[in-house]
Every structure is written in structure tokens, then in C-alpha cells.
UniProtKB/Swiss-Prot annotation:
GO terms for biological process: nematode pharyngeal pumping; nematode pharynx development; proteolysis. The active site is at residue 172. Its EC number is 3.4.24.-. Zn(2+) binds at residues 171, 175, 181. This is Zinc metalloproteinase nas-7. It holds the Pfam family ShK. It comes from Caenorhabditis elegans. Metalloprotease.
Length: 382
């Protein structure tokens, strides 16, 4: 009796996969000689997009990508920031070509994002000229992903069907310009808590840090409002938070456009001729609930005042947010997050640099003693 069902499954699934593969194959054929670009009609359509069309339902990049990173690195390359001139786009000029598989509405979304870069920064997305070897190809390749900064030859920015949303396009293009995610900053532990126990094991490497010696934040403070900041549930294996801001009234990961700090960093990276002074708040004014799995209800975070910092300070002495005294206590059984008002011990440091790899097993009886000795900070033992 099961045979007919088996036959149905075998005949239906390959057809679906075959369609997806054909689209991908078509894109790969187009990449090599594409010169198609946005036109005046696309930009006119972009100006007519409604707020709902621009800022409607947002699907996190990691969900679209099935919990894979949206940053793709060349083989053998380590994760590092962009501070060397060779990784920047010369003269802030990004030659590009786009896939013919985008609909008029999708082309309008791309045009809107490009227009924002042109209006707020000196970055210029320019149509690729025939025979130009180094350029950005924007197409429906496989999910949402980009390399960081400029690479040689044809560079792919994949914006597939699930990625065609304004905020996602702005986010991915900022990777193209040269920036990693905000939560990967070397100083992130001063501003967010990583809840390792709640992170999907296959995504632990998404919470590494960018090497300070190989990146620059151009004197800008940690930015909770950055378009490049993931949300509190990013890569969660159990629906509970994977990272939380130390400023308890702040929210992360719900940006729908550039923050002021995003724009400031881009303009400083590319030495844009005009840059306005920016004051960046370190906390959101909104009152945001945190889900508590133990009580199955929402518990509100208490409000605290906003703090602002002058963005004119130089890169040698970057402005820093006041580091709150609260520390996090995480239940090993449920993933529940609570705040502890006591200051963490100044001696609370990991003794090795790879604690993240086994952070989801901190309280496993087999390695508990080793983890408590080598990784007390990551495991929240102190």
C-alpha cells in the first residue's frame, strides 16, 4: 500500500529541485558576460514604492539561508575586517551588472537601495562596461550572501527570492562595501552578552570576533541600531535569545535602514568629502519585552536613560558606551535569561580562545571541570 506514495514522492521532488537548479544554472551562465544594469524606469518605479513595499514583512537573513552565514569568504581566507586599500573599491566606484531574472518590482527595490547609497555616501554603483573584468554581479544565485569588500574578478552578491526586501538589500550591499556584522566587533563583549547555550551548534562560528589588527571601525562606537546587527534570536536552537544588549532598554536587529553610524563609517572608510557630525544613541527609546520560557509570559525590561556620544572623536580614542554593571545568568536547563545586578569579577576571563566551540556543553558532566577551569567567562561560571 505504501508503494504509490513512494512513487509520488520520487516523481515530484526531483521536478521541484530541477527547477531551482535550472534557475541557478542560468544565473551562472549570465555572470560571465552580463552587462545589464538598472535603468531610468527602475529608478522612477523606486520613487513610487510605498512604505509597506519597502518596510513590510522582514525575514532575517539567517532564516532565508537556512542558518548559513550571509558572508562568503574566498578559500583559505580568515575572517577579518577591511582596512587595507586593496580591499576597498577604488574611488568608491562599484561596477555592477544584474541578473535578467528580476521582476520590475524587484528591480525597483534594487534601485531604491542604490539610490540611498548615492544620496547618503560617496559610494557609486555604476553599470559595468563591456569587457570590464572586475565587477559585482547581482543575481538570484543561492540565498542571500556577499563577500566583504572588493575581490578580484567577478564578485557575486546573491539576492534570491526570499532576500528581495529593502533592508536585506541595504544589509548585503554594506558587506560589499566592506563591513562585517556589528556583533562580530572585537569589543562586542562590552556591549552584548552572547548566550552560547542557546546557539545552534552549526552556527557557533557566526559569533566569532573580527581581529582588531585587521579591521577598523573608524572611531565609531558600537551600534545597536546598525543595519548589520543581527537580532536577539539569531541562530537560536531553541527559540530563546542568543545575544542580548547590556543596555537593557536597547533593541537589536530590527533596523530597516542605515543607522547614522552606518553612514558615518562608510563615509570615513572611503574618505567621502562631506560628512555630517552624528550623535548616536546607545539605547532604543522603545520598551521591549523579553520572552521568558519558564513562566510563559512577557517580562518587560526596565527603561534606562539614553546615552549619546560625539562622533567627531578620532579613531585612536573611540567613544565608548558606559558598560552596565548587570551581568547575565542563564539557566542551563531551559535557556532562560536573567540579569544579575552584581558586577562580574575582574578575574573572570577565559584561558583559551576556542571556548565557543563547546559552549553549548558547558555543563555536560563529561567536560564540566575542564570548561569551568578553561572557559569560565563563556560558560557564565563567574
Amino acid at each position: 500500500m505504501l508503494l504509490p506514495w513512494i512513487i509520488t514522492i520520487v516523481t515530484v521532488i526531483p521536478a521541484t529541485l530541477g527547477h531551482r537548479n535550472r534557475v541557478q544554472d542560468d544565473e551562472m551562465l549570465v555572470i560571465s558576460d552580463s552587462t545589464d544594469s538598472l535603468n531610468l524606469e527602475d529608478f522612477e518605479f523606486a520613487d513610487k514604492l510605498t512604505r509597506e513595499e519597502l518596510f513590510g514583512k522582514h525575514i532575517p537573513v539567517e532564516v532565508v539561508n537556512d542558518f548559513k552565514s550571509d558572508i562568503r569568504l574566498p578559500r583559505r581566507h580568515k575572517r577579518n575586517g577591511v582596512s587595507r586599500a586593496a580591499k576597498l573599491w577604488p574611488n568608491a566606484r562599484i561596477p555592477y551588472a544584474i541578473s535578467p531574472h528580476y521582476s520590475p518590482h524587484e528591480r525597483a527595490l534594487l534601485a531604491k537601495a542604490v539610490k540611498q547609497y548615492h544620496e547618503k555616501t560617496c559610494i557609486r554603483f555604476v553599470p559595468r562596461q563591456t569587457g570590464e573584468p572586475d565587477y559585482l554581479f547581482i543575481g538570484k544565485v543561492d540565498g542571500c550572501f556577499s563577500e566583504v569588500g572588493r575581490t578580484s574578478g567577478v564578485q557575486v552578491l546573491s539576492l534570491d527570492n526570499g532576500c528581495m526586501e529593502y533592508a536585506t538589500i541595504i544589509h548585503e550591499m554594506m558587506h560589499v562595501v566592506g563591513f562585517y556584522h556589528e556583533h562580530e566587533r572585537w569589543d562586542r563583549d562590552n556591549f552584548i552578552d552572547i548566550i552560547w547555550q542557546n546557539i545552534d551548534r552549526g552556527a557557533l562560528d557566526q559569533f566569532g570576533k573580527v581581529d582588531l589588527s585587521k579591521t577598523s571601525y573608524y572611531g565609531q562606537p558600537y551600534d545597536y541600531k546598525s543595519i548589520l546587527h543581527y537580532d536577539s534570536l539569531a541562530f537560536s536552537k531553541n527559540g530563546f535569545p542568543t545575544m542580548l544588549p547590556k543596555v537593557k532598554s536597547a533593541t537589536i536587529g530590527n533596523a530597516r535602514d542605515f543607522s547614522d553610524v552606518d553612514i558615518s563609517k562608510i563615509n570615513r572608510m572611503y574618505n567621502c568629502p562631506v560628512e555630517k557630525s552624528v550623535t548616536a544613541p546607545f539605547a532604543r527609546a522603545r520598551h521591549v519585552p523579553i520572552y521568558s520560557p519558564q513562566y510563559h509570559k512577557y517580562e518587560d525590561r526596565p527603561k534606562i536613560p539614553l546615552r549619546s556620544f560625539d562622533m567627531q572623536q578620532g579613531p585612536i580614542n573611540p567613544p565608548m558606551a558606559q558598560i552596565p554593571s548587570q551581568s547575565l545568568v542563564v539557566s542551563s536547563s531551559s535557556g532562560r535569561v536573567n540579569y544579575n545586578s552584581n558586577k562580574p569579577s575582574s578575574q573572570c576571563e577565559d584561558r583559551i580562545t576556542v571556548c565557543w566551540w563547546t559552549a553549548d556543553r558547558c555543563r555536560s558532566p563529561a567536560i564540566y571541570q575542564v570548561m569551568s577551569s578553561l572557559c569560565p567567562k563563556t560558560c557564565k561560571f563567574c
